[in-house]
Structure formats: structure tokens, C-alpha cells
Amino acid sequence: GVQTCALPILPTVLHPHIWEVKKVYQYIHFEPVAFTTKQIKVTNWHDFIGLEDYKLHWTVETDGKAVQSGEMDFPVMAARSSAFITIPMNLIPNDGKEYFLKLEAFTKKEAPLVPKGHQVAMEQWQLNPEGERLLNATWTARELVDKTVNTERTPDAITLTGENFRIAFSTADGEMTELLYNGKNLIKEGLQPNFWRALTDNDVANNHLERCGIWKFAGKNAKLQSIDLKEDSNKQLATVTVNYKLEAQESTLQTVYQVRPNGAVKVSMHFVPGNKSLPEMPRLGMRMILPAEYDVMTWLGRGPQENYADRKTGYPIGLYTATVWEQFHPYVRAQETGNKTDVRWVALRNKAGEGLLITGEEPLNVSAWNFPLEDIDYVAFNTERRHGGSIMKKDMIWLNIDHRHMGVGGDNTWGAQVHPEYTITPHEWQYSFTMQPLSNQDDAAEKAHKKWF
């Protein structure tokens, strides 16, 4: 493909997919054992050597932070053999949080081209998958005392206000126009539905633009049908419901905003297809634009490199922080970049520590850029191809908050499509996430555990 053919003329910068290659190629494999959390199965896939030159390091993590860890030698294991190992971890508390076990194999000594302490294998799995995430989340009467949501509707706008916030919607197109917390507007453009991604090299090769182009402007061209306001009798919840028609797709879309007296906003999107036969969707989600100052991104999800539905096993779930510009990878030809899968929450903050927290009701796909999608999208027959290194920062943070993002494929680079299990079929879909303001005193991880709806 383009990336491979260009390797001889590129600087020695690793592409993000190398970490998935490393994971798939690893010669030490770890598996959970049914009905126990402490026992694991280790398989040595080497053809000739044992594992005496490697150390096993284990870590139990919650909210991206280690709460237990240890190190041990592997048992004596011949090539192509398996063994069971007991990890000496303590019981996992039933506190409603997610706990993950991460297993890593490191070299004990230096070898040609391989330093001592080099990670040669990694695996991670959740220890309490049956536990409900955010089970311990509560909101108390004390937090809501003397706080209400006030509403106002004019011919041009719907406005919701509270003690330290103001949220406004245009009645002309249903878009959120203000998200003010403590006098600062956190948006330059409000949430809009988005079904398109900047085409990857594999997308171009399999005629994705011709096959799925109906989705490119589906969100932008959505026609407002109605916008309604409802508030409960004690002013503890205000709801704005926006209904759209996707005319070319013969489908409908509903976005519901629920607002609590503390300024927390739950956003729910509901897509319903009609009878028209439609191709797969490149992505299913929403996007918004924030001021450029909110350029420090922290997320609890897979990382730190970009990853996708069919390319994510080499990127453990963890707590990561980077600038928004660091999310961008300069491929030879500019294209989709920076996606993170299985994101529990993401925070975008300015240098003062203020910003916005997004928490998914289910794990999200999230990406953030310093430019609009159009800057990296593929333009057919454009003689001036955009080199990844030519993309420039703009005065913005483009934030994608997706329920689904299709895989990248790659069985070959001359026509193979993404496997069906990693595509997005246009049936009925709905998802939700919550937005909350962050002060410089707020711990984003702890605030993400609050449940306001």
C-alpha cells in the first residue's frame, strides 16, 4: 500500500499499526482460566526455546491506575508447551468500578538489538465483566439543594440556565449554540450528527467513496422537523428534543438533551432507517468544535496510539494524556487519524485545568483534531494530494464522539473491504453520553463516576 511503498523515503517514525503487528506476532500468549480470576494459562509459542530469559509482570488497574502489581519468573516451559500460573492478587472489591489485569513479559538480559527490560508480550482482560460500570454512582439531595434549571423559549432560541451555566439552542436548526460554564463558552460549534470519516488508503482502494458516499453529508444536510422543550415540575430536569429528517437516506434522527441543575447534559442520539436500501456507515456519532485552548486530552480507553475496531488488541485500556495535536499521525496521504476505541471518558482541558468531560453510557470511539475533517478527507481526481506533513493547526478543537467507527480492513490494499463484524449496518441505533464542566480542582476520573441521569 501507500504507507509500505513510501517506507524507503520516510524518516524512521513508526506508524500506529506497528503496535498491533507486535501484539499479533508475540510468542508468549496469556489466557484467562474459567471460573477463577487468579489463575492464567501461559503458552510458549517459540519453536526452540523456553521462557527462562523472561520475567512476568502483572498489574491490576482501575481507572487507569495500578492498585496491585507483582513480578515473577515463568515456570520451566519447553517450546510449544503451556502451563498454568496463579497470580497472587488480592480479591477485587465490589465497588462498581472496572478492574483489569494486565500481563507483560520482559527480557531479563540484553541481547543483540534487544535491550534488557524490553516488553515482548502483553495481554489484558477485565476481571469483573459482570459488574455494572458506574454501579456506585449516586447523586444526593445535598448536591441539588436550592438548584434548579430555568428555561426560556423565544422564536429564535431555547435557553436553559442554572447557577453557573447557560445552554442555548437555535430553533432554526436545532444546534446547540452556547455551552457556558462560569461565563466561558466551551463550544464554537455545537453537536452535529456525523456519519463520515476521512477516507483511508484502504477505503479509497475498495471504492468506499462511490459505495458509501450517501453518508458524507448526511449529518450536515439533516433537515430540522421539530424542536421541543419540556421541564419537570420541580425544575430538576429540562429536556430539549430535536427531530431531523435525513431526506437522501429516507431516515430519521432524534437528538435529546437532558440538563440537570448542576449543568450536566445527557445527549442521546437515535437513528431510525426507512425502507431505502443503504450501504454501510463509515462512522455513527456526533462531532463538535471547541475553542483551541482546550488542547490537553486525557482519556480512559485504549491507547496511547490510534486504534480501531479491527485493530485494537495491541493498545491496552489505560489512562492517557496527550495534546490534541499529538493525536494526529502524518500519514503519507492525509486521512482518518487518531481514533481511540473503548473510551470510558475523555476530558479536554486548557492550561488552567478547566474544560469539558465526556462520559459514555457505553464505551465510545473518540478522536480530537486541530483541524476540520475536510482538511484530511480524500478528494477524488485532486492533483494536489494532501501530504500528512502538510496539515496545519487551526484555531479549533474538532471532537468526534462516536458510538461506532468502522474498522480499517487491510486483508489487501487493492479492493478488500472491512470484515462484516467491523462495519456499521444502517439499522436502528441509539447511544448516549454525558457532558460535564471541569474546574481545575476536579478529578476527571472521580467525576466520571457520578451518575446524574
Listing of model-derived features with the role each one plays in the protein:
Residues 105-114:
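Short acidic/polar inter-strand loop motif in beta-rich domains
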Residues 55, 98-102:
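Short, conserved beta-strand segments of beta-strand-rich sandwich/propeller modules, principally
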Residues 68-70, 118-123:
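Extracellular and select intracellular beta-sandwich modules with Ser/Thr-enriched
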Residues 30-33, 114-116, 296-299:
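Acidic/polar loop patches that form or flank catalytic/metal-binding clefts of enzymes
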Residues 79-80, 117-119:
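Glycine-centered loop/turn motifs
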Residues 39-46, 87, 101-105, 164, ...:
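Buried hydrophobic-core signal for structured, non-transmembrane domains
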